[in-house]
A protein has these predicted regions:
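His/Asp/Glu-enriched, well-ordered alpha-helical/loop segment
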Residues: 18-19, 25-38, 163, 183, ...
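Active-site-proximal beta-strand/loop segments in catalytic clefts of secreted hydrolases
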Residues: 9-11, 65-68, 167-169, 193-194, ...
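Polyanionic/metal-chelating signatures
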Residues: 50-192, 320, 326, 352-354
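Intein/HINT protein-splicing elements and their conserved insertion hotspots or analogous self-processing inserts
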Residues: 125, 335-356
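Metal-associated gating/positioning segment near the N- to mid-region
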Residues: 1-67, 71
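Short, charged, surface-exposed secondary-structure boundary motifs
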Residues: 91-92, 200-202, 220-228, 320, ...
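C-terminal cap of metal-dependent C-N hydrolases
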Residues: 288, 300-345
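Active-site environment of divalent metal-dependent phosphoester hydrolases
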Residues: 13-16, 46, 68-73, 171-175, ...
Length: 356
């Protein structure tokens, strides 16, 4: 079986790399509820061993690295090609637009409310966001404004050059964010996690917003409590855009299995989703939400040759990548020990033989 290269729309490889120690924790600039001035690429460590594992085990050829969700506005995300490089600049996806990470709900109000500052409630979340957008609109309309890195990013969102990726769980909050986006004049490209997206599939379809979701992870906090296994299937039936994401260094190695689980959950309810549509959840739809669908995400003439050859049905738990090409270059071959990228960090470490 051959598929387009797998794309993970939500990853923290590099900004929360392995080994997971405090010294490497660089994903949340949790010093202010709005930090649009920070860029995830300035935290990415290209030697994170997770990149090679995502390629070899998951067939990941492109991925979006996002700031964390402590802040209402977490900063710019960056799209990378999953290629070995000494620098983050050497991994950046040519021509990919920047993303902008936002978060609603529990995380910002918990982080800043616990410090006795705003926001400490959901209404505080919206108020801080709206005030920040109003200031950005003034900046965007002032040709003589002094350069401001944060407002420059927000201006990019307002002009459509930077795509919004909004961490949000509850249906009512996603609807409020869409109201705010209309008020302020920007578009949400995707809601991430979105465990209650199934409740508003029609609204998401009408607003052309993708839902980047897990197959079966929910219930770990109150705002994620009302998740269902059929989230993806209900969204697909409604004609909304579905993306399966990882947000995890392990799940990124098996997004094909996650997509298959979501497909199976729908089938148990009588929603039969074709395999080709399911593969799009981890290829074309992700590319669309990231603004790179004209360059990758499907196997078409003129697109980047990001390709995975599987040793069986890619929607089977028993299947693994056999070969992976990025931009036409063979980067992984399961039958050739020399064709397996290894992080320089792992060389010379105990257990080195496991990765060579």
């Amino acid at each position: 079986f051959v598929t387009p290269g797998i794309i993970d729309i939500h990853s923290h490889l590099g900004d929360y790399p392995s080994p997971e120690v405090e010294a490497n924790s660089d994903g949340n600039e949790a010093t202010s509820p709005t930090t649009p001035e920070v860029w995830a690429e300035h935290s990415v460590w290209p030697q994170d061993p997770g990149f090679a594992r995502a390629l070899a085990n998951g067939g990941i050829t492109s991925l979006q690295i996002l700031p964390g969700s402590a802040n209402l506005m977490g900063g710019r995300s960056v799209t990378l090609k999953n290629v070995p490089a000494r620098t983050t600049q050497g991994m950046k996806f040519p021509g990919a637009p920047y993303g902008f990470k936002m978060a609603c709900g529990e995380n910002p109000k918990r982080v800043y409310g616990s410090r006795g500052r705003m926001p400490s409630t959901r209404m505080g979340n919206l108020a801080v966001n709206r005030e920040t957008w109003l200031s950005a609109i003034d900046y965007a309309n002032d040709p003589k404004a002094k350069r401001d890195l944060g407002k420059e990013t927000l201006k990019g969102v307002l002009t459509g050059e930077i795509l919004v990726h909004n961490h949000c769980y509850r249906a009512d909050e996603m609807a409020l964010v869409l109201d705010m986006a209309k008020e302020m004049g920007y578009k949400v490209s995707a809601f991430h996690h979105a465990v209650e997206a199934y409740k508003i599939g029609d609204l998401l379809r009408e607003n052309d917003v993708c839902s980047a979701i897990w197959a079966d992870w929910y219930g770990f906090k109150m705002e994620s409590y009302d998740g269902i296994l059929e989230n993806a299937a209900f969204l697909q039936r409604e004609g909304a855009c579905v993306v399966i994401h990882s947000d995890d260094k392990n799940d990124i190695q098996r997004l094909n299995q996650e997509a298959a689980k979501a497909q199976a959950a729908g089938l148990r309810l009588g929603i039969d989703i074709p395999d080709a549509a399911v593969i799009q959840w981890i290829t074309y739809n992700a590319a669309k939400a990231m603004g790179i669908e004209d360059m990758t995400g499907s196997l078409e003439p003129g697109k980047m040759a990001d390709v995975v050859l599987w040793n069986g049905d890619p929607l089977s738990v028993y299947t693994r990548p056999e070969r992976v090409w990025v931009d036409g270059a063979l980067l992984f071959d399961a039958n050739d020990p020399k064709r397996r990228p290894v992080s320089d960090f792992e060389l010379g470490q105990p257990g080195e033989g496991d990765v060579k």
